[in-house]
């Protein structure tokens, strides 16, 4: 079809969607129907819908068809942190904080200001961090069941940066990475910028379908597996020991790198050992202090096999040179005096209290989650569209996430993810009531 006819069709459909002439939720003609109606080749009709999907105007749903999306939702929802209105209750992003943390920071900064090595913190630091600070993080990791020497710990600018340096140091564009079909959006974002191919693995209970994973490894040259075995985001599962051992066996059999994300692992009480303990020779363990202490610190860490450390150091040098010494010194002092352990314990209690509140307020709504996590996954009935629920809640001054940012496959389930850790309990109760009401109203439509 000549481009003069092809582009105007895309423009016309886009205009109809943006103007509301084709309202959100409208089922569009099938590819064959569109081709017949417009006199197109089937491949051209497919291209029309692909362009509309790239513009964020439609979504193709396997087995259901192509639907008009809610355009009121901002792009990259739950990946990009936007400045919210003062009266907006944010259930899309987790940045848990406890009363009194600001005073802890004041005290710690005064102590740091009086320390003897303050001038040293104003200089450039080693790319992987000062050895003293790395040793403190290694000590912290012992509480997670992971024993590594300080030389194998690298300090980074938050766990997100830890993921980035791992992918940049160990993988090449075009490499295949196995991931959960629903996973942390930040990983997907970095993988896209590095031009990696994500191969989604469906869930099977509390973890990925390992039969499907092994089949993938037999058929494709899988370079890495990214997983959150302890407090998966967004589903909250904690893999049991046999499943972890089976996952490790697959990685070893096929020579695959394991990338273990432990961002929320501190919330689990007595979890099985990390994958990095079970397979230290092929596992990179990534976590940070944003969730267990405060998001504004932006201090994370990577524990990696020794042969990979120098590659990662070079990437740290290329991206940030070093993590700010003042921040790493602050974290080290809080590890040393027990503040981190205390805050983690208090946040475990806080997360469980918020989960109990969610159970009480959400009532009979189907949900998936862990009693100790800071998030809840709400699968919706087949006739309910998640984007319409999300827009309705935005009008009620409540921000939530749909499944779209978490999905790594073409099949995007209609579901809502709630982040419970960022608002005061009273505001959370009111917001959860609005969520329940919005879902029930759309279910009854």
Question: Residues of each region from the PLM?
Answer:
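PLP-dependent aminotransferase class I/II
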Residues: 285-370
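Short beta-strand(s) of the beta-wing in winged-helix/HTH DNA-binding folds
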Residues: 23, 59, 284, 400-401
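N-terminal basic, amphipathic alpha-helical segments
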Residues: 1-113, 122, 317-324, 345-353, ...
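Conserved core of the PLP fold type I
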Residues: 120-254, 265-284, 441-443
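Short Gly/Ser/Thr- and Asp/Glu-enriched loop/turn motifs at secondary-structure junctions
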Residues: 63, 149-150, 369-375
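Short hydrophobic/aromatic beta-strand micro-patches
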Residues: 303, 377-379, 419-421
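Walker B catalytic acidic pair
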Residues: 262
């Amino acid at each position: 079809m000549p481009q003069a006819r092809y582009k105007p069709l895309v423009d016309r459909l886009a205009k109809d969607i943006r103007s509301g002439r084709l309202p959100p939720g409208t089922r569009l003609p099938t590819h064959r129907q569109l081709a017949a109606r417009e006199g197109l080749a089937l491949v051209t009709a497919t291209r029309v819908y692909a362009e509309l999907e790239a513009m964020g105007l439609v979504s193709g749903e396997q087995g259901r068809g192509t639907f008009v999306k809610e355009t009121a939702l901002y792009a990259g929802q739950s990946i990009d942190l936007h400045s919210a209105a003062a009266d907006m209750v944010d259930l899309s992003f987790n940045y848990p904080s406890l009363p009194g943390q600001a005073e802890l920071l004041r005290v710690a900064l005064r102590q740091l200001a009086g320390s003897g090595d303050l001038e040293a913190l104003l200089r450039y630091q080693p790319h992987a961090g000062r050895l003293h600070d790395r040793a403190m993080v290694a000590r912290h990791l012992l509480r997670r069941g992971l024993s590594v020497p300080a030389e194998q710990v690298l300090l980074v600018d938050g766990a997100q940066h830890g993921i980035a340096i791992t992918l940049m140091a160990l993988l090449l564009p075009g490499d295949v990475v196995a991931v959960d079909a629903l996973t942390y959006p930040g990983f997907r974002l970095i993988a896209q910028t590095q031009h990696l191919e994500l191969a989604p693995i469906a869930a099977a209970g509390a973890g990925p379908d390992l039969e499907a994973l092994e089949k993938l490894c037999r058929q494709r040259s899988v370079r890495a597996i990214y997983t959150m075995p302890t407090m998966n985001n967004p589903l909250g599962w904690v893999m049991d020991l046999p499943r972890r051992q089976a996952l490790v066996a697959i990685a070893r059999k096929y020579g695959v790198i394991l990338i273990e994300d432990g961002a929320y692992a501190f919330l689990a009480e007595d979890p099985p050992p990390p994958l990095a303990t079970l397979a230290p020779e092929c596992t990179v363990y990534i976590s940070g202090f944003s969730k267990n202490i405060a998001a504004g610190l932006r201090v994370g860490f990577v524990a990696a096999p020794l042969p990979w450390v120098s590659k990662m150091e070079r990437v740290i040098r290329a991206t940030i040179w070093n993590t700010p010494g003042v921040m790493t010194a602050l974290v080290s002092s809080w590890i040393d005096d027990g503040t981190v352990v205390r805050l983690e314990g208090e946040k475990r209690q806080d997360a469980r209290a918020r989960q109990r509140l969610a159970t009480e307020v959400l009532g009979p709504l189907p949900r998936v989650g862990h009693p100790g996590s800071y998030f809840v996954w709400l699968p919706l009935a087949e006739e309910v569209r998640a984007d319409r629920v999300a827009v309705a809640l935005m009008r009620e001054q409540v921000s939530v996430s749909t499944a779209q940012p978490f999905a790594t496959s073409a099949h995007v389930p209609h579901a809502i993810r709630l982040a419970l850790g960022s608002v005061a309990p009273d505001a959370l109760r009111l917001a959860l009531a609005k969520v329940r009401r919005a879902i029930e109203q759309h279910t009854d439509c």
